[in-house]
Design a protein with these regions (language model features):
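N-terminal beta-strand motif that seeds the catalytic metal site of vicinal oxygen chelate
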Residues: 1-19, 61-63, 112-118
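Vicinal oxygen chelate
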Residues: 5-13, 54-118
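Secondary-structure boundary/capping motif
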Residues: 13, 17-21, 38, 48
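Conserved active-site tyrosine of GNAT-family acetyltransferases
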Residues: 18-23, 77, 103
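Conserved short beta-strand elements that form part of the metal-binding/catalytic scaffold
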Residues: 28-61, 105-112
Length: 118
């Protein structure tokens, strides 16, 4: 069963507040608003992130963003006032963990080992 792509989704308390925060994080407004309580961002090399308003589940999600230069992202996130102190590095990958305003966990991952998938 071939998989063409993937869509990550996270619940938020207020979709409009989440749109404001994620638009700053991604440097662009959502690519799609399929419903009033849903916003979606498409990534250049594939994949989507969907945020949807469901207050009772907000803050319980997590997803990973694959990046080519984690230090560049740390600098940009620091400028936005995001806590970038949760970093780690191994022989295969560097990671940074942050949280959105609702407490959803976001991992940034940079492959060091070229055999790792991007």
């Amino acid at each position: 069963m071939p998989i063409e792509n993937a869509l990550a989704s996270v619940a938020v308390k207020d979709v409009n507040a989440a749109i404001e925060w994620y638009a700053k994080l991604f440097g662009k407004q959502p690519d799609s608003r399929p419903m009033p309580e849903v916003a979606e961002w498409k990534f250049e090399r594939g994949g989507w992130l969907q945020v949807y308003q469901l207050p009772e589940r907000a803050g319980s999600g997590s997803f990973t963003l694959a990046v080519s230069d984690i230090d560049e992202h740390v600098a940009q996130l620091t400028e936005l006032g995001v806590d970038t102190s949760h970093r780690s590095s191994g022989s295969k990958v560097k990671t940074l963990m942050i949280a959105d305003p609702d407490g959803n966990h976001i991992a940034f991952a940079e492959a060091i080992d070229t055999s790792m998938a991007r």
